[in-house]
């Protein structure tokens, strides 16, 4: 099992429609590649964890790095882990928009104080991503699709 945790800046201020399109495509592609993970959006910054086969995760991350919708891509942590345990279960792309209070309310999510992603270390990032993944699975389908 291989994992990458990174942050990046949103260059285009995704509309809700653009975010949904991105998530649908990402979930399809990640599912086909056996990749799981979660994406958290807050104040124009993304925080994401990807996990799965090393080659598939690295290829996905390389594609993300070339995407002009992102900048300031910074790996917070990466590496192989022993065993097949996944931190994000079966989530091909869990997602929480921490700035969207209506999404959070519709999923009965209480949001903690979300720190500036540029100041997170890998342990704090992982804790925040686990928090997001726990909330993703409880959100209604219409908030995720």
Task: List PLM regions with ranges.
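Charge-rich, low-complexity N-terminal segments
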Residues: 1-145
């Amino acid at each position: 099992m291989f994992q990458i945790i990174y942050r990046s800046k949103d260059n285009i201020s995704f509309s809700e429609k653009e975010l949904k399109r991105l998530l649908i495509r990402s979930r399809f592609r990640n599912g086909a590649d056996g990749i799981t993970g979660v994406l958290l959006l807050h104040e124009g910054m993304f925080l994401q964890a990807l996990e799965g086969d090393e080659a598939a995760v690295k290829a996905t991350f390389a594609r993300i790095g070339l995407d002009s919708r992102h900048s300031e891509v910074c790996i917070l942590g990466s590496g192989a882990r022993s065993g097949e345990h996944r931190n994000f279960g079966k989530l091909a792309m869990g997602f929480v928009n921490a700035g969207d209070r209506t999404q959070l309310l519709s999923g009965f999510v209480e949001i903690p104080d979300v720190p500036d992603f540029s100041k997170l270390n890998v342990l704090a990032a992982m804790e925040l991503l686990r928090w997001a993944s726990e909330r993703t699975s409880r959100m209604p389908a219409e908030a995720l699709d």
